[in-house]
């Protein structure tokens, strides 16, 4: 089941990257990421990072999972890859704007990664910047943590095509659960 989901996610990433799916429906998707160790850094810096080789489905909302629940959500406003080279850090802006402030956050993420044994320096990572993370409690009601990324169609969860602001969405998700 998880292997098939990975194959489907990779295929969707390929389709979006190569323009085979011309209209993005990212507005209705939330990507949930496991963030136990780095959760506090993610919240305080309004960023989440992941290995750049990992594909992903287009999404506007990013959720951070910790302790059996999505604990925070944020609207993605920039997506930037970065890796250290002998000539300094090489950045690639996929979406949004590369600012000096975002470069500083990436440098701090690399330092934070070092403290947890993660190699964010020599392995290219993708940085998802959000406006801010809003606290929520979108509980997983089945045993065991998820095996990795999970995509949620917010229109199905909310029963509406109207996706509210991130702070309102965070409040609404507190009344929902998932398996």
Q: What positions do the PLM features span?
A:
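Charged, terminal alpha-helix-loop-beta segments
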Residues: 1-136, 143-152, 156-179
């Amino acid at each position: 089941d998880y292997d098939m989901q990975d194959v489907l996610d990779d295929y969707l990433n390929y389709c979006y990257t190569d323009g085979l799916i011309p209209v993005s429906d990212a507005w209705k998707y939330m990507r949930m990421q496991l963030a136990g160790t780095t959760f506090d850094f993610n919240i305080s810096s309004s960023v989440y990072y992941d290995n750049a080789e990992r594909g992903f489905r287009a999404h506007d909302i990013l959720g951070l999972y910790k302790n059996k629940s999505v604990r925070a959500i944020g609207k993605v406003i920039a997506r930037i890859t970065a890796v250290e080279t002998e000539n300094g850090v090489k950045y690639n802006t996929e979406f949004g704007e590369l600012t000096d402030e975002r470069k500083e956050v990436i440098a701090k993420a690399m330092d934070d990664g070092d403290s947890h044994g993660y190699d964010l320096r020599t392995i290219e990572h993708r940085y998802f910047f959000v406006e801010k993370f809003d606290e929520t409690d979108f509980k997983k009601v089945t045993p065991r943590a998820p095996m990795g990324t999970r995509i949620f169609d917010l229109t199905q969860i909310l029963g509406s095509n109207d996706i509210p602001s991130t702070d309102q969405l965070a409040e609404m998700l507190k009344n929902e659960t998932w398996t």
